[in-house]
C-alpha cells in the first residue's frame, strides 16, 4: 500500500515541485497540497496522511505552531522543509524537539543534477519517516541540564580515552539526551550526525547551551580536548588522527561513504585506527547501515561499543545492523545509555 503524503507549503512553486517528485514514485501517494495551516488541518482530518512535508515559514499560523498542535491532536510523521539560514536552522531544531522526524533544506534548483539529487533525498526521507517511531517530545530537550551526581572519571581516563557517537534520523534529539547524561569532565567526544551544510553549527551551538561541557563544530587540524565535544560539519567527513600523543580533527570532502557525507563509518574507522582500545563508540537511532562497518572495526581493535535500544529509537536501522554483526557489547535504551557508558569509563584506567 502506497505511503500517503501531504505537502504543506505557502509557495506555489515548492508545492508543485514536491508534488511532482512525490508523484514520480509508485511507493508514494500524494493525497493533497495545502498552502497554509488551516487548509492543512482540514486535509489531515480528511486524508489521514502517513507523512507530511511541512514548511516552517508560513502565513497566518507558522509551521512550528501547526506542528505543535498536530503532535498533540494527531501525531504524524513530519519532514520539515527548512530555509538555509541561521533562523531557519534554529527553527528546524525546535521542530525536531517538538516531534518532527527529519528535515531537508529547501530545494536549490540551479542544475538538473541538483534537482535529481534533491528528488532522491526527499523521497528517501519521506519513506524513512513513514517507518519511523513517533516518540514523545523530550520534556527537558530545550532546558539546560540540571546537576546530578555522576561517577568521577580519573584524570588518566579523561586524558587517554575518546568517545565517538554516530546517528542519523532522530539523532539530533537522541544526541542531546545522551550528552545531558554526561558530567562536565569527560574525554574528548566526536560526533557525526547526518546533516547538510548550514545546520551543524547551529546544532553544535544548541548542544553547547544545553549540556555541561563545551560543544563546537570541528575544525581542521584542531586538537581534541577533554571536556569538549566536536560535531562533524555538514557535507564534510570528520576523522581523527593522532599527532604527538594528541588526537586531532581531520576534515575532508571525499566521496560519500555508505551514502553519506559526513559518514559515521568514516569517523568510526579513524577512531578504530588511532584510538583502538581507548575508544568508546555509540551508535544511535538512524535509517540504513552507516556506522556498522566502522563500529565493527572499533570492536576488533579492542574498543568498547554501545548501541541504542530499539524501544527508544526513532528508526532502528543503524543500531540493528551493528548488533546483527555482533559488533556491540551493550544494547541500552537511551534514558540509561549515558549512565551505562559512564560506568564503563569509570572502571578503566583507575588511578
Swiss-Prot record:
It is found in: Cytoplasm. Belongs to the CheB family. The modification 4-aspartylphosphate is found at residue 55. PROSITE patterns: CHEB (PS50122), RESPONSE_REGULATORY (PS50110). SMART domains: REC. GO terms for biological process: chemotaxis. Pfam families: CheB_methylest (PF01339), Response_reg (PF00072). It comes from Shewanella oneidensis (strain ATCC 700550 / JCM 31522 / CIP 106686 / LMG 19005 / NCIMB 14063 / MR-1). This is Protein-glutamate methylesterase/protein-glutamine glutaminase 2. It is an enzyme of class 3 (hydrolase). The active site is at 168, 194, 290. GO terms for molecular function: phosphorelay response regulator activity; protein-glutamate methylesterase activity; protein-glutamine glutaminase activity. The keyword Cytoplasm applies. Involved in chemotaxis. Part of a chemotaxis signal transduction system that modulates chemotaxis in response to various stimuli. Catalyzes the demethylation of specific methylglutamate residues introduced into the chemoreceptors (methyl-accepting chemotaxis proteins or MCP) by CheR. Also mediates the irreversible deamidation of specific glutamine residues to glutamic acid. HAMAP family: CheB_chemtxs. Its EC number is 3.1.1.61, 3.5.1.44.
Amino acid at each position: 500500500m502506497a505511503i500517503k503524503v501531504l505537502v504543506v507549503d505557502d509557495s506555489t512553486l515548492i508545492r508543485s515541485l514536491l508534488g511532482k517528485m512525490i508523484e514520480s514514485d509508485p511507493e508514494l501517494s500524494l493525497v493533497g497540497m495545502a498552502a497554509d495551516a488551516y487548509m492543512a488541518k482540514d486535509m489531515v482530518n480528511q486524508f489521514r496522511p502517513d507523512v507530511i512535508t511541512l514548511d516552517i515559514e508560513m502565513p497566518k499560523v507558522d509551521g512550528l505552531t501547526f506542528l505543535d498542535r498536530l503532535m498533540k491532536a494527531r501525531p504524524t510523521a513530519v519532514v520539515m522543509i527548512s530555509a538555509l539560514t541561521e533562523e531557519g536552522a534554529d527553527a528546524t531544531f525546535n521542530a525536531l524537539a517538538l516531534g518532527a522526524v527529519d528535515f531537508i533544506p529547501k530545494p536549490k534548483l540551479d542544475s538538473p543534477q541538483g534537482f535529481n539529487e534533491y528528488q532522491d533525498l526527499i523521497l528517501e526521507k519521506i519513506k524513512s519517516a513513514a517507518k519511523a517511531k513517533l516518540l514523545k517530545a523530550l520534556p527537558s530537550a530545550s532546558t539546560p541540564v540540571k546537576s546530578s551526581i555522576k561517577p568521577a572519571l580519573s584524570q588518566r581516563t579523561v586524558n587517554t580515552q575518546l568517545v565517538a557517537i554516530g546517528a542519523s534520523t532522530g539523532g539530533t534529539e537522541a544526541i542531546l539526551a545522551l550528552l545531558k547524561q554526561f558530567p562536565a569532565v569527560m574525554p574528548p567526544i566526536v560526533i557525526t550526525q547526518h546533516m547538510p551544510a548550514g545546520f551543524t553549527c547551529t546544532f553544535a551551538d544548541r548542544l553547547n547551551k544545553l549540556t555541561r561541557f563545551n560543544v563546537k563544530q570541528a575544525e581542521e587540524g584542531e586538537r581534541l580536548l577533554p571536556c569538549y565535544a566536536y560535531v562533524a560539519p555538514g557535507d564534510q567527513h570528520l576523522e581523527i588522527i593522532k599527532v604527538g600523543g594528541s588526537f586531532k580533527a581531520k576534515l575532508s570532502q571525499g566521496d560519500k561513504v555508505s551514502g553519506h557525507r559526513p559518514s559515521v563509518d568514516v569517523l568510526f574507522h579513524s577512531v578504530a585506527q588511532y584510538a583502538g582500545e581507548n575508544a568508546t563508540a555509540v551508535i544511535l537511532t538512524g535509517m540504513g547501515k552507516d556506522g556498522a562497518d566502522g563500529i565493527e572495526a572499533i570492536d576488533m581493535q579492542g574498543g568498547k561499543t554501545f548501541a541504542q535500544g530499539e524501544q527508544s529509537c526513532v528508526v532502528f536501522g543503524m543500531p540493528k545492523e551493528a548488533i546483527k554483526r555482533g559488533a556491540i557489547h551493550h544494547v541500552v535504551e537511551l534514558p540509561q545509555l549515558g549512565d551505562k557508558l559512564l560506568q564503563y569509563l569509570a572502571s578503566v584506567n583507575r588511578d
